[in-house]
C-alpha cells in the first residue's frame, strides 16, 4: 500500500473517533433543552429555547414582571421553592404566561407568595396604593396548569384570556387579608375566552371566587370558596366582548361569603348571557344573598333600576342549598321587562335569612 493511502486511512480514522456517539449527541441535546432559572431576567430572556423549565426560588425585582409569555410550544414549566416579588406601587402583572401546549406545575412545597399585605389598605383597586395584578394567563392555548399554590395577592389573583385551558387543583389563599385590609382579591377573572375548565380550586379571599365577564364553554367544578363574594357571572357589559355563553358551575361549596350564586349585568349596556347552569352548590354563612340575579349595575354598584340590553336566558339552577345569616336575603331577582326568560329552577333549599319583597320581572320557572 502506498504511503499516501496509509495517510488517508489514518485521517478517516481520526475523524470517526472524533465524532461523538449518537447517544452522546442525544444527551447534549437533552441538556440544552432543560433549563433551571434563578432570576426573572434569565427566565424571560431564555425561556423560548427550553422545553423543560424550572423556576427555582426566583425573587422578582420590584416593578418587574416574571414574563414567561415566550415559552416554547409544548414546554413544561415547574415552580420550585418560594417565588417572591419586590415592593412597588404599579399595575403589574407580577407573572405573565403565554404559549401553546404548555404544562405548568409546582414542585412539592412550592409557593408563589405575593406578600400582599404590603399593598393592602382596604381599598383594593378603588383608591389608595396602586396595586399590581398578580397573574395573567393570556394568549395561552391548549394548556394545563395544575397544583398551583398562590398566597396573598395584592389584588386580583388570576386573569384568564385563553383558549382550551385546564386549571386544576389551584390554591389561592388570601385569608390573611380578612383582617388586614385585603380587598378586590378575586380568585379567577375570565374574559374573552373559549374553553376554560377549572376543577378542584380552593379560594380564600375578599372578592369573587370566580367572575366570568365574557367568554363561552367555561366550567368551574369541585371548588371550595370562602370569605369572598361567591360564584359570579359579571358584571357583564361595557367591554369589547359582552357575551357569556355555555357556563357550568357545579359541585362546589361557598362559605362565609357575601353571596352564594350571582349574575349581574350593567345598566343600559348591551350584550348577552345565556346557557348558564349552577348545579349542586352548597352554601353556609352567607351574609348578603343566597342567589342574586340583577340587571342594574352601574359604576360597580346596583342602582335598583334594571335595563333590558343584556338578556339573561336559559338559566338552570339545580340544587343550590344551605344556610344564610339572619340579615341575608335568600333570593333576589331584578330583571328588566321581558329580558329574563327560559329559566329552570329545582332543588333550591335555603334556610335562614329572609325573603325579598323587591323582586321584579321574575321569569316563569324561578321563584323569589
From Swiss-Prot:
Xref: SUPFAM superfamilies: Pectin lyase-like (SSF51126)
Gene Ontology process terms (BP): cell wall organization; pectin catabolic process
Catalytic activity: (1,4-alpha-D-galacturonosyl)n+m + H2O = (1,4-alpha-D-galacturonosyl)n + (1,4-alpha-D-galacturonosyl)m
Record's keyword terms, sorted: Cell wall biogenesis/degradation, Cleavage on pair of basic residues, Disulfide bond, Glycoprotein, Glycosidase, Hydrolase, Repeat, Secreted, Signal, Zymogen
Annotated catalytic residues: 207 (proton donor), 229
Enzyme Commission number: 3.2.1.15
SMART domains membership: PbH1 (SM00710)
Disulfide bonds: 35-50, 209-225, 335-340, 359-368
Gene3D superfamilies attached to this UniProt entry: Single-stranded right-handed beta-helix, Pectin lyase-like (2.160.20.10)
Residues listed as glycosylation sites in the UniProt record: 44, 46, 246
Function: Involved in maceration and soft-rotting of plant tissue. Hydrolyzes the 1,4-alpha glycosidic bonds of de-esterified pectate in the smooth region of the plant cell wall.
PANTHER family attached to this UniProt entry: ENDOPOLYGALACTURONASE B, POLYGALACTURONASE
Protein name as catalogued: Endopolygalacturonase I
Classification of source organism: Eukaryota, Fungi, Dikarya, Ascomycota, Pezizomycotina
Amino acid at each position: 500500500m502506498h504511503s499516501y493511502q496509509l495517510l488517508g486511512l489514518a485521517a478517516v480514522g481520526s475523524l470517526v473517533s472524533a465524532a461523538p456517539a449518537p447517544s452522546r449527541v442525544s444527551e447534549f441535546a437533552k441538556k440544552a433543552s432543560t433549563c433551571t432559572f434563578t432570576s426573572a431576567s434569565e427566565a424571560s430572556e431564555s425561556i423560548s429555547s427550553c422545553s423543560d423549565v424550572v423556576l427555582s426560588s426566583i425573587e422578582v425585582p420590584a416593578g418587574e414582571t416574571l414574563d414567561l409569555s415566550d415559552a416554547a410550544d409544548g414546554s413544561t414549566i415547574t415552580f420550585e421553592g418560594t417565588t417572591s416579588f419586590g415592593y412597588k406601587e404599579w399595575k403589574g402583572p407580577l407573572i405573565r404566561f403565554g404559549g401553546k401546549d404548555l404544562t405548568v406545575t409546582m414542585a412539592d412545597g412550592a409557593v408563589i407568595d405575593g406578600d400582599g399585605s404590603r399593598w393592602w389598605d382596604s381599598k383594593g383597586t378603588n383608591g389608595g396604593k396602586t396595586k399590581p395584578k398578580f397573574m395573567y394567563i393570556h394568549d395561552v392555548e391548549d394548556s394545563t396548569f395544575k397544583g398551583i399554590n398562590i398566597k396573598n395577592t395584592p389584588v386580583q389573583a388570576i386573569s384568564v384570556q385563553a383558549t382550551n385551558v385546564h386549571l386544576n387543583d389551584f390554591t389561592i389563599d388570601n385569608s390573611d387579608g380578612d383582617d388586614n385590609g385585603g380587598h378586590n382579591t378575586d380568585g379567577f377573572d375570565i374574559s374573552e375566552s373559549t374553553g376554560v375548565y377549572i376543577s378542584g380550586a380552593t379560594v380564600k379571599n375578599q372578592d369573587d371566587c370566580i367572575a366570568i365577564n365574557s367568554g363561552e364553554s367555561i366550567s368551574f367544578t369541585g371548588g371550595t370558596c370562602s370569605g369572598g363574594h361567591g360564584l359570579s357571572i359579571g358584571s357583564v357589559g361595557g367591554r369589547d366582548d359582552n357575551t357569556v355563553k355555555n357556563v357550568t358551575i357545579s359541585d362546589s361549596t361557598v362559605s362565609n361569603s357575601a353571596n352564594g350564586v350571582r349574575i349581574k349585568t350593567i345598566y343600559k349596556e348591551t350584550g348577552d348571557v345565556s346557557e348558564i347552569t349552577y348545579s349542586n352548590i352548597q352554601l353556609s354563612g352567607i351574609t348578603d344573598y343566597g342567589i342574586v340575579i340583577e340587571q342594574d349595575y352601574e359604576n360597580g354598584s346596583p342602582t335598583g333600576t334594571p335595563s333590558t340590553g343584556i338578556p339573561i336566558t336559559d338559566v338552570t339552577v339545580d340544587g343550590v342549598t344551605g344556610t344564610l345569616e339572619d340579615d341575608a336575603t335568600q333570593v333576589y331577582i331584578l330583571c328588566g321587562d321581558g329580558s329574563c326568560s327560559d329559566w329552570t329552577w329545582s332543588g333550591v333549599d335555603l334556610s335562614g335569612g329572609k325573603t325579598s319583597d323587591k323582586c321584579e320581572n321574575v321569569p316563569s320557572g324561578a321563584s323569589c
